[in-house]
Curated annotation (Swiss-Prot):
GO terms for cellular component: cytosol. The lineage of its organism: Bacteria, Pseudomonadati, Thermodesulfobacteriota, Desulfuromonadia, Desulfuromonadales. It comes from the Bacteria. It comes from Syntrophotalea carbinolica (strain DSM 2380 / NBRC 103641 / GraBd1). This is Probable transcriptional regulatory protein Pcar_2335. Belongs to the TACO1 family. InterPro entries: Integrase-like_N, TACO1_YebC-like_2nd/3rd_dom, TACO1_YebC_N, Transcrip_reg_TACO1-like, Transcrip_reg_TACO1-like_dom3, YebC-like. Gene3D superfamilies: 1.10.10.200, 3.30.70.980. Keywords: Cytoplasm, DNA-binding, Transcription, Transcription regulation. Coiled coil: none annotated.
Length: 248
């Protein structure tokens, strides 16, 4: 799930992902396999594979699992063939939602995703219905009480597009092509982020609260529980207090 960038939501997302570590491994293995199939198994020459392997390492995936996934992608080991793509639609409260998927059975995935939208009052749309509301960017988040001035200086010098501060949380935005350079430069300066990824960032946020916020989070959780779903992006804005109440 990727929505509002406030620290409360980042922490919710991280906690939810940690609780679903088995599913996270499944999704990461798919991403590594597809990246290796498309661009080959050489990490130096395949940026998508490099990013996928980095995420797997951050999730503490065993090295053997990573190497096996690469070999399945390159054909050195037998593996499943996956189709990838996106679904777009609206969730409760008119929140725009993008779902990235990888599947070996598109018919099943379409039915499952549509069911998740419908169950909680959302609606699946056509391709292009909400994608224009998002930009693909590198996003590097530093936790509360981070050294904004140092991050700002290092990040912009390394090629970042923007650096924001909100309640002590620092967010660095980059073009996708510059993400690795900026992240690595920050790391070399001893600046370790809470999260770092190429993601879809909303251009505008949609505020939701009460029952709509609850239904939205349930819908997103149901989508993320689907093994065929890789990522869910949404332009929701839920207050810290409301998010804490929903997550109980």
């Amino acid at each position: 799930m990727a929505g509002h960038s406030k620290w409360a939501n980042i922490k919710h997302r991280k906690g939810a992902q940690d609780a679903k570590r088995g599913k996270i491994f499944t999704k990461l293995i798919k991403e590594i396999t597809v990246a290796a199939k498309i661009g080959g198994g050489d990490l130096e020459a395949n940026a998508r594979l490099r990013l996928a392997v980095d995420k797997a390492k951050q999730a503490n995936m065993p090295k053997d699992n990573i190497e096996r996934a690469i070999k399945k992608g390159t054909g050195d080991l037998d593996g499943v063939t996956y189709e990838e793509g996106t679904f777009e639609g609206y969730g409760p409260g008119g929140v725009a939602v993008i779902v990235e998927f990888m599947t070996d059975n598109r018919t099943r995935t379409v039915a499952d995703v549509r069911h998740s939208f419908n169950k909680f009052g959302g609606s699946l749309g056509v391709s292009g219905s909400v994608a224009f509301m998002f930009d693909r960017k590198g996003q590097i988040i530093f936790g509360e009480n981070s050294d904004f001035e140092k991050i700002f200086e290092v990040a912009l010098e390394a090629g970042a597009e923007d650096v924001n501060d909100e309640d002590g949380v620092t967010e660095v935005i980059t073009a996708p092509a510059d993400f690795e350079t900026v992240r690595n430069t920050l790391a070399e300066q001893g600046l370790t982020p809470e999260s770092a990824e190429v993601t879809m960032i909303p251009q505008n946020m949609t505020a939701v609260e009460g029952k709509q916020a609850e239904s939205l989070m349930k819908m997103i959780d149901m989508l993320e529980d689907n093994d065929d779903v890789q990522n869910v992006f949404a332009n929701f804005d839920i207050s810290d207090e409301e998010m804490a109440r929903i997550m109980g």
